[in-house]
Swiss-Prot record:
EC number of this enzyme: 3.1.26.4
Gene3D superfamilies the UniProt entry points to: Ribonuclease H-like superfamily/Ribonuclease H
A GO cellular component entry from the record: cytoplasm
Protein name as catalogued: Ribonuclease HI
Organism name: Vibrio cholerae serotype O1 (strain ATCC 39315 / El Tor Inaba N16961)
Function per UniProt: Endonuclease that specifically degrades the RNA of RNA-DNA hybrids.
Lineage, top ranks: Bacteria, Pseudomonadati, Pseudomonadota, Gammaproteobacteria, Vibrionales
Biological-process GO terms, alphabetical: DNA replication, removal of RNA primer
Length: 156
């Protein structure tokens, strides 16, 4: 695991649920690459998570990764909550199914391939790469092309 890659991610949702998208900025040495995709019906949290999953999946080999997100949900979920969810068979402390378990499991699998340091940055605070990701995610949400097959509407 020699290569160190910086990854910045953001998710956006126009309405929650509604059309959504993710934006990713990846940097290796001085080279930056961006990724984005829009979904017809999803949530903001799913887009935040999917951004991290897709960014890590895009790495062709195990790397040392500094992943910066403006989502406390993603950062706390993957660094703190996930351990007990796995012990409980993907149930919360009150025995309910973990929301977005499909993406938590995918993120868990991807983080196992890499050495990931999770960082949080305040959104909409002028952080260059976060602002780039936000714009990519918003543009993707405005032009959705995919179905979020894992999205499950809340029971009414």
């Amino acid at each position: 695991m020699n290569k160190q890659v910086e990854i910045f991610t953001d998710g956006s949702c126009l309405g929650n649920p509604g059309p959504g998208g993710y934006g990713i900025v990846m940097r290796y040495k001085q080279v930056e690459k961006t990724l984005a995709r829009g979904y017809r019906l999803t949530t903001n949290n799913r887009m935040e998570m999917l951004a991290a999953v897709m960014a890590l999946q895009a790495l062709k080999e195990p790397c040392r990764v500094i992943l910066t997100t403006d989502s406390q949900y993603v950062r706390q979920g993957i660094t703190q909550w996930i351990h007990n969810w796995k012990l409980r068979g993907w149930k919360t402390a009150d025995k309910k199914p973990v929301k977005n378990a499909d993406l938590w499991q995918a993120l868990d699998k991807e983080t196992a391939r890499h050495q990931v340091e999770w960082r949080w940055v305040k959104g909409h605070a002028g952080h260059r790469e976060n602002e780039m990701c936000d714009e990519l995610a918003r543009q993707a949400a405005e032009n959705p092309t995919e179905d979020d097959i894992g999205y499950q509407p809340e029971p009414q």
